[in-house]
Amino acid sequence: MATIDLQKKSVKIVLEKKQLTKVTARVGLVLDITGSMRPLYKNGTVQNVVERILAVADQFDDNGLLDVWVYDNEFSRLKPVSEKDFSGYVDREILNNDRLHKFGRNDEPPVMKDVLRKYVTEEPSSYPAFIVFINDGGCKKSIKPIIEASSDKPVFWQFVGIGNGNFDFLNKLDTLEGRVIDNTNFLHIEEIDRISDDELYDALLAEFPFWLKEAKEKGIVREQEPPAEKPKKKGFFSRLFSK
């Protein structure tokens, strides 16, 4: 069985455990591409992250696509990745893309604003957005007003700190005041390529169900109706004897 199939199986188990199998959500991935991340892009770690989060999108997303952004002191909204074209995605769309700004310093607010622009302004939907935000430290406190302002929007920010950088501000997200509801979670994984798929997905989706429940109660996310069953086509004998 291919790796992506095993990852999808792991996601499905976690979704069943957290009673999320009937939930449809849009999934976005924001990747830190500052200078300190260069080795992780070069050694395949980031490609592996893309594939693992794609498995979440495949099980969770309304169209099976994973929306991707990269950011340093600039940001880019990249081509979404799917199960058909995930192989070599990082090399093709990022490392070999000369038009892409990369390996500069970090500046989170602009990319966060673009994420909200896409999911709230450009493509409003009854489906919530689940955003996995990868950062290797030094996340600016200037994201605070963006988190506060988006707390009444159908967007959940799952921050993932990798490595052993400074995550002081991200560690304080749970105590952040001035929000309609708690719309963030922070997960620190020092070596993301060493954590198992089961552990990763369980941790990534730990807080999302609680946010989703409260967001529905407050009318931020609308209740999703189950898809209507398509009428079954009658066979020849069924048509014959129904006359």
From Swiss-Prot:
InterPro entries: vWA_TerF_C, VWF_A, vWFA_dom_sf. Residues 231-243 have a biased composition (Basic residues). Transmembrane segments: none annotated. Residues 26-204 form the VWFA domain. This is Uncharacterized protein YcbR. Residues 222-243 are annotated as: Disordered. It comes from Bacillus subtilis (strain 168). It comes from the Bacteria.
